[in-house]
Design a protein with these regions (language model features):
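Active-site neighborhood of HAD-like aspartate-dependent phosphohydrolases
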Residues: 17-67
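Asp-based, Mg2+/Mn2+-dependent phosphohydrolase catalytic module
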Residues: 3-7, 13-27, 63, 139-160
Length: 160
């Protein structure tokens, strides 16, 4: 079985060549999507604000919603806004209503990421995407930003 290494890439042109040398014994490189390949802040926080607005909650500073980035949405609505299970499920539906149409395209690819992925592929690495985001959204984001061709596998969560 091949050695696997899960890495969170922080792109730095000066260190890229040195970093690949550190990974030379590995065949597969696993990347997360949010916070590693793309910055999801605008799409996620605007979609959370949209969901909260449905409940009469207005958020003026989207940065207040950054804690929603990463953990499961339902849990975040319960933790940060004391929603009931039913309210949290409805909030997730409202979130996805906006996110599936607009929010997923509001991601920003980190500068230099496409070049890093291209160089890794040229060096013979198999690139994999492992994300907690629903894989249907992850695949759409990668395709939208023309990054889908770099990854031989994209794995994420289901919509439930």
């Amino acid at each position: 079985m091949a050695d696997l290494l899960y890495i969170r890439v922080i792109y730095n042109k000066r260190r890229m060549k040195q970093s690949f040398n550190l990974f030379s014994k590995y065949q597969y490189l696993f990347f997360d999507l949010d916070g590693t390949v793309t910055d999801p802040m605008q799409g996620i926080t605007r979609s959370v604000a949209y969901a909260l607005n449905h409940f009469g909650i207005v958020v003026n500073d989207l940065r207040e919603l950054c804690p929603f980035i990463g953990p499961p949405l339902k849990d975040s609505f319960i933790e940060f806004y004391q929603f009931t299970e039913v309210q949290a499920e409805e909030a997730v539906k409202k979130y996805r209503e906006r996110y599936s149409e607009t929010g997923l395209y509001e991601n920003e690819v980190y500068p230099g990421m496409a070049e890093l992925l291209e160089q890794a592929r040229r060096k013979g690495y198999q690139l994999m995407m492992a994300t907690s985001k629903p894989d249907v959204f992850a695949k759409l984001i990668l395709k939208h930003f023309h990054l889908d061709g770099y990854f031989s596998f994209v794995g994420g969560s289901g919509l439930d």
